[in-house]
Amino acid sequence: MTRLVVATRNKGKLREIAAILDGLPFTLLSLEDFPDFPEVEEDGKTFEENALKKASVAANITGLPALADDSGLVVDALDGKPGVYSARYSGENASDEANNAKLLSELESVPYEERTAAFRCTIALCSPGGKRYTFSGELHGVILDSPRGTGGFGYDPLFFVSEKGATMAELPLEAKNAVSHRGRALALLKDHLGWQGIE
């Protein structure tokens, strides 16, 4: 079975990716399987730039095909913030709770109808030989004024999906993966892998 490196140490993200790619003939490895793997600086200006950088570095270092995602929250009332800085919105190595608190603070005076936002995700697939592919997904919602739900990670407890009547953190994993930005991008990746494989 072909090994595929998922360039992340985020267990929540890895769990979502594994659930969606289930059934494909790949053994998934994470960066936890490569303890000496260096930290890759996410210095791109777009989700695509960051995803391609992480996947290509992982493919080159491990000698295996690799996929990486870069995703984040884009809030209309904040001119697209936190964007590519979503994971470190309140500072380097910030916790989900700290990032959520900063977001709520910045939206404190913004009325509900103006709290529109989107989760965006770009997945990059790179081979050690230099082939590169990208797949993108998006999900629209509204930022609530307090967290709801205990599932998921990141901004999930604040991101309300109207058609589901729930936050991302309130949805079971299977339901979340069916509608999420990452789920949509991974569905495109899965289709690609099913038809073309990694090369």
Curated annotation (Swiss-Prot):
One of its GO terms (cellular component) is cytoplasm. The keyword Metal-binding applies. The keyword Nucleus does not apply. HAMAP family: Non_canon_purine_NTPase. InterPro entries: dITP/XTP_pyrophosphatase, ITPase-like_fam, RdgB/HAM1. Transmembrane segments: none annotated. This is dITP/XTP pyrophosphatase. It catalyses: XTP + H2O = XMP + diphosphate + H(+); dITP + H2O = dIMP + diphosphate + H(+); ITP + H2O = IMP + diphosphate + H(+). NCBIfam families: PRK14822.1, RdgB/HAM1 family non-canonical purine NTP pyrophosphatase. Its EC number is 3.6.1.66. Homodimer. Keywords: Hydrolase, Magnesium, Metal-binding, Nucleotide metabolism, Nucleotide-binding. CDD domains: HAM1. Gene3D superfamilies: 3.90.950.10. Pfam families: Ham1p_like. GO terms for molecular function: dITP diphosphatase activity; ITP diphosphatase activity; metal ion binding; nucleoside triphosphate diphosphatase activity; nucleotide binding; ribonucleoside triphosphate phosphatase activity; XTP diphosphatase activity. Its cofactor is Mg(2+). It comes from Geobacter sulfurreducens (strain ATCC 51573 / DSM 12127 / PCA). One of its GO terms (biological process) is purine nucleoside triphosphate catabolic process. It comes from the Bacteria. Signal peptide: none annotated. Pyrophosphatase that catalyzes the hydrolysis of nucleoside triphosphates to their monophosphate derivatives, with a high preference for the non-canonical purine nucleotides XTP (xanthosine triphosphate), dITP (deoxyinosine triphosphate) and ITP. Seems to function as a house-cleaning enzyme that removes non-canonical purine nucleotides from the nucleotide pool, thus preventing their incorporation into DNA/RNA and avoiding chromosomal lesions. Belongs to the HAM1 NTPase family.
